[in-house]
């Protein structure tokens, strides 16, 4: 592709900014990043309260975040944030330690069995499911792997018929492999972080995000945070780009005619040679001249209704010294209840705590935002936390994905076969996963493959 091509990138979240960085590294200089919000970073969103930043979206990373680290180096930032500690609570708010055999001697047989199954899963992933961890989903439903290896920095292609098992939901996948207890480890950084319930989400999503090494870093609390929030990574990257993102851009229409791409911003038209879409593909047909294939495929996308509130505690009342995980609430039967509250700044009771809830599950009625918010705050009260006020809240369009049948029917292979048609390229969360490492990796690989 000619290096002087004019390229439009829709979205200035991790995916869009990663695409821009790697276009620059590949010698492209004529690109524009168009962002509808008034800030960059997407769901890496770190507002200020009382002089410090807190997290409303992405919170942490770990040493397997290779692509994010590359962006850190580009922007000149480091993971220099507060160390994260966590405790566990029952649904009644009372503290307990489900993983400590000294405090729970009756649980020793269960814990030993769980440890054995986790080890078994690690072995299976490295052998039976070789190739499971590479970026993107192309080939999985056909028993192949075709993605980016962040460890070597190379695109890897191969065959492994066992990978078809990743099309089934994670609960069934664990049952098939007789490692059901491993779910007790994976659920904390998965369901609590808003990515859905194990009996409805294809195993490929779970394991591409929480590959074995990443899962173990979460277990051992070998985690990265950022003093100025995850948003600061992308602010720094944006400042270093030759063409920083244009903010508050309202794209009204996109057409693809005469071998070019026409992007309408209000009543003005800008013409490009290529377009990379990192904004939600589910909504692409509402403003693109979408093909019938685009309409049909993108209509199959669903997403999680994941809500976050940032609250302060009443002065002089109990302020926890670490985050709290409520495993009992991470099941469909407790939909809408508090799954985790996040504590960021030690010994600073004037700082916020953030609450996290899921409102949707297949076959169950969607909880309303206000209904789930009340449930979460009532759960906070059970934890001994007396809420003063809400300083920030957000309803996220979160973790776009497809379900088992569409995954197995080759949804990803069909979308990947469309890459480059009508000078259009698809990236963002749906093409990989909803965490920042996978989205950043996918954009890097997309640029390497096509630009």
Task: Name these PLM-found stretches.
Residues 43, 51-82:
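Conserved FAD-binding subdomain of flavin-dependent enzymes
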Residues 342-451:
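Conserved flavin/dinucleotide-binding core of flavoenzymes
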Residues 15, 39, 282:
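Conserved Rossmann-like nucleotide-cofactor binding loop
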Residues 26, 250-366:
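Mid-domain catalytic core of redox enzymes
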Residues 210-265:
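Helical element adjacent to the flavin cofactor pocket in flavoenzyme catalytic cores
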Residues 5-32:
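N-terminal Rossmann-like FAD-binding beta1-loop-alpha1 element of flavoenzymes
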């Amino acid at each position: 592709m000619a290096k002087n091509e004019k390229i439009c990138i829709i979205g200035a979240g991790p995916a869009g900014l990663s695409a821009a960085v790697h276009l620059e590294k590949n010698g492209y200089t004529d690109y524009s990043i168009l962002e509808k919000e008034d800030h960059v970073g997407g769901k890496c969103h770190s507002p200020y309260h009382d002089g410090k930043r807190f997290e409303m979206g992405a919170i942490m990373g770990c040493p397997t975040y290779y692509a994010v680290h590359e962006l850190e180096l580009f922007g000149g930032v480091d993971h220099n944030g507060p160390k994260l500690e966590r405790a566990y609570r029952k649904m009644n708010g009372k503290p307990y330690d489900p993983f400590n055999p000294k405090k729970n001697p009756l649980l020793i047989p269960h814990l030993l069995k769980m440890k054995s199954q986790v080890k078994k899963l690690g072995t299976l992933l490295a052998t039976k499911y070789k190739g499971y961890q590479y970026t993107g989903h192309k080939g999985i439903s056909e028993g192949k792997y075709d993605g980016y290896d962040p460890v070597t920095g190379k695109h890897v292609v191969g065959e492994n018929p066992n990978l078809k098992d990743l099309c089934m939901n994670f609960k069934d996948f664990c049952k098939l492999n007789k490692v059901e207890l491993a779910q007790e480890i994976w659920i904390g950084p998965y369901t609590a972080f808003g990515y859905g319930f194990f009996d409805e989400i294809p195993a490929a999503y779970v394991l591409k995000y929480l590959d074995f090494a990443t899962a173990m870093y979460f277990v051992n609390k070998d985690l990265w945070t950022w003093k100025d929030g995850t948003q600061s990574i992308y602010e720094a990257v944006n400042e270093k780009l030759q063409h920083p993102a244009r903010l508050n851009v309202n794209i009204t229409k996109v057409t693809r005619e005469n071998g070019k791409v026409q992007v309408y911003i209000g009543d003005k038209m800008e013409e490009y040679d290529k377009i990379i879409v990192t904004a939600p593909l589910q909504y692409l047909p509402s403003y693109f001249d979408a093909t019938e294939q685009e309409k049909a495929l993108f209509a199959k996308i669903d997403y999680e209704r994941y809500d976050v509130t940032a609250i302060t505690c009443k002065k002089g009342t109990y302020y926890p010294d670490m985050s709290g995980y409520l495993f009992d609430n991470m099941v469909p039967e407790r939909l809408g209840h508090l799954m985790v509250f996040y504590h960021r700044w030690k010994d600073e009771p004037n700082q916020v705590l953030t609450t996290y809830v899921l409102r949707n599950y297949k076959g169950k009625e969607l909880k309303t935002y206000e209904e789930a918010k009340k449930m979460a705050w009532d759960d906070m009260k059970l934890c001994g936390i007396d809420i003063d006020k809400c300083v920030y809240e957000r309803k996220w369009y979160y973790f776009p994905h497809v379900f088992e049948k569409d995954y197995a029917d080759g949804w990803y292979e069909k979308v990947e076969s469309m890459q480059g048609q009508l000078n259009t390229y698809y990236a963002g969360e749906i093409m990989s996963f909803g965490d920042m490492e996978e989205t950043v990796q996918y954009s890097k690989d997309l640029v390497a493959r096509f630009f």
